[in-house]
UniProtKB/Swiss-Prot annotation:
Disulfide bonds: none annotated. Catalyzes the hydrolytic deamination of adenosine and 2-deoxyadenosine. Its EC number is 3.5.4.4. This is Adenosine deaminase. The active site is at 200 (proton donor). Substrate binds at residues 14, 16. Binds 1 zinc ion per subunit. Zn(2+) binds at residues 12, 14, 197, 278.
């Protein structure tokens, strides 16, 4: 089965985890940014999981270097453009890029300038390629609560202009949703859609709380609902889409192997599963690679993929017009 030629949708892709290594090197040289190595083969080890990784926290260390080159308008625009260029080459028709604006203020940019720069890169790529992109703003759980309010408030002016949703990301502690009730309440009032990283690092109950306390419409990862019957039941009853990222889950030790990953069990049981990359560079993956691995190790069929694709269309925060266009590509999903 040629997965490369199939139309695809990406709902969970971090901008700072999906840079070209050549671009990191190019910007570092241009802007005099120190790197541990200026040799591409050596640098890859600092930004990608090449062999083993023991935890989500270790995985997140791979973002340190990419963020060093994402501190100017020009660089942010370029990196956003290149991400859409890369996924368009993988026949991705629609992507929701997510990033945390406050990771990009080191050289004095304000939140509005940061968001504008990324949106400019997305829009420039849309003009050149058969792809549509939207932006999800991330609030970092390892920063204070006022910082989350700041992102929500300052990003609101871009809703309807490319920004579609708010997210909570970074390391996952038990019962984190309780801290963010007022933040997400405000986000909902502004008109943001809501997706929350939860159930990625061993705490299925966080998914339950993300839905009940934060009004999450989608869940990033959600793999650990397999160990929380109440969360599983709620996700199924409310038809909450899961943005699953199998290779990333292997890297963070949320799953031992592709075969052991619960996505197929969830899919067969009617859970609205979608397949995503999480971080193309950190996990050294593409949507095509994800599908090839799931086909090889889990028996993913073309009919399964049709369901996954339509799940992603429905789960997306795209406009109704864009969704209709995306649905029209279903006829191209053939073995």
């Amino acid at each position: 089965m040629n997965f490369k030629k199939l139309p695809k949708i990406e709902l969970h892709c971090h901008l700072d985890g999906s840079l070209r290594v050549d671009t990191i090197l190019d910007i570092a040289k241009k802007d005099n940014i120190p790197l541990p190595s200026y040799n591409k083969k050596e640098l890859i080890n600092y930004v990608s999981i090449m062999d083993d990784c023991n935890s989500l926290d270790e995985y997140l260390n791979k973002f340190f270097i990419p963020n060093k080159v994402m501190q100017t308008k020009e660089n942010l625009k370029r990196i956003a453009f290149e991400l859409l260029e890369d996924v368009a080459a993988d026949n991705v028709k629609y992507i929701e890029v997510r990033f945390a604006p406050l990771l990009h203020v080191e050289k004095g940019l304000n939140i509005e300038e940061i968001i504008e720069s990324v949106l400019e890169g997305i829009k420039e790529a849309e003009k050149l390629y058969d792809i549509k992109g939207n932006l999800i703003l991330g609030c970092m759980r390892n920063m204070d609560i006022p910082s989350a309010f700041e992102v929500v408030k300052k990003g609101a002016k871009f809703i309807g202009k490319g920004v579609v949703a708010i997210d909570l990301c970074a390391g996952e502690e038990p019962h984190f949703p309780g801290k963010y009730i007022e933040v997400l309440k405000l986000a909902k009032e502004y008109g943001y859609r809501i997706t929350i990283h939860a159930g990625e690092a061993g705490v299925g109950e966080n998914v339950l709380e993300a839905i009940n306390l934060l009004n999450a419409e989608r869940i990033g990862h959600g793999i650990y609902i397999k160990d929380c019957a109440e969360a599983y039941k709620l996700v199924k009853e409310k038809n909450i889409p899961l943005e699953m990222c199998p290779t990333s889950n292997l890297h963070t030790k949320a799953s031992e192997s592709y075969e052991a990953h619960p996505f197929m069990d969830f899919l067969k049981d009617g859970i609205k599963v979608t397949i995503n990359t999480d971080n193309m560079t950190v996990s050294n993956t593409t949507i095509t690679k994800e599908l090839e691995m799931l086909n090889k190790f889990c028996g993913l069929s073309i009919e399964d993929y049709k369901i996954l694709y339509l799940n992603a269309v429905e789960a997306s925060f795209a406009s109704s017009e864009t969704k209709e266009v995306l649905k029209s590509y279903v006829k191209e999903i053939t073995a």
